[in-house]
Amino acid sequence: MTRRCSHCNHNGHNSRTCPNRGVKLFGVRLTEGSIRKSASMGNLSHYTGSGSGGHGTGSNTPGSPGDVPDHVAGDGYASEDFVAGSSSSRERKKGTPWTEEEHRMFLLGLQKLGKGDWRGISRNYVTTRTPTQVASHAQKYFIRQSNVSRRKRRSSLFDMVPDEVGDIPMDLQEPEEDNIPVETEMQGADSIHQTLAPSSLHAPSILEIEECESMDSTNSTTGEPTATAAAASSSSRLEETTQLQSQLQPQPQLPGSFPILYPTYFSPYYPFPFPIWPAGYVPEPPKKEETHEILRPTAVHSKAPINVDELLGMSKLSLAESNKHGESDQSLSLKLGGGSSSRQSAFHPNPSSDSSDIKSVIHAL
């Protein structure tokens, strides 16, 4: 029995040894030469192009990118974000770089509105960028500013510092002034002229008087041409106007001086010093300070030195020997002034005691 291929319906081989077999994935045989694209809704044109290319001469692989036109190959998937009409199907869309004007307006909005209000900066200042792009640009700007101390490899747009307020054009600083009516502008100009030249109201009267005088003088004089009189009057008028303008111009202040400030309130009284002492009072002269001497004590003998031999009774002291009866003939005493003292001394025995009794007692023992 001859083998029959289930793939090409030819005899002599089976589907496993078929030379025209394709790739089988999940039970489905894929016969397309290119499997990079699928037959999805976003790739129908490529699917049709590859199908039509398969019926060609066969010189190239059917469905290869070389057989597909540029506009067909550029369709691809809807989620791949390919550039439409590009020759390269894998070319990705690139963002447009920020210009200096956009970055300057971004810095101005960042200075006015602060960090975080990216929607306000995008709406009022950088109108060509979305809030997401403004936030991304701000993140790059802050990272660049935090790495200022490091070595910079190349200059960047983020190195620009915010300009001063004086360098910003007036239409950007005050955008609401464009809607001001013409009448208010005229009134503002009139008020400015009035404040700058308050004394200019009196100038026409002076000029008119001098002009009348010059006209009278020209009318009174005869024989002078009118052109000469008109030239003289115009020159005098020009000199007077220049003098008035020089008087009305404010004097320039020195760079280190302060403007003169006049007090807004004047007190009804003025303080001045008033002496309390009467007019004829003469103050006493100051007393001189007295000088004090330091007194130091000195040892002085007020009496003559005492002689020990002259002391009362000191030379009459004697120690007498006792007699044979055991009684002392002379007692150790101090005789003052030759008188006897009635006071009993500790060195004298009691005279009232009887010696016989003592002896008897001793003998009795």
Swiss-Prot record:
Motif R/KLFGV (transcriptional repression) mapped to chain: 24-28
Tissue distribution: Expressed ubiquitously, except in hypocotyls, root tips and lateral root primordia.
Cellular component GO terms held in the UniProt record: nucleus
Induction: Slightly induced by CdCl(2). Accumulates in the dark. Diurnal expression pattern with maximal levels in the morning (at protein level). Specifically induced during leaf expansion. Expressed in old and dark-treated leaves.
SUPFAM superfamilies associated with the record: Homeodomain-like (SSF46689)
Zinc finger (CCHC-type): 3-20
Chief location: nucleus
Listed Low complexity bias regions: 220-254
Annotated region of DNA binding: 118-142
GO molecular function terms noted in the UniProt entry: DNA-binding transcription factor activity; transcription cis-regulatory region binding; zinc ion binding
Subcellular location: Nucleus
Keyword Transcription regulation included in the entry's annotation: yes
Superkingdom as given in the UniProt entry: Eukaryota
Domain-level remarks: Contains a R/KLFGV repression motif, which may be involved in the activity of transcriptional repression.
Protein name (database record): Transcription factor KUA1
UniProt organism field: Arabidopsis thaliana (Mouse-ear cress)
Gene that this polypeptide is encoded by: KUA1
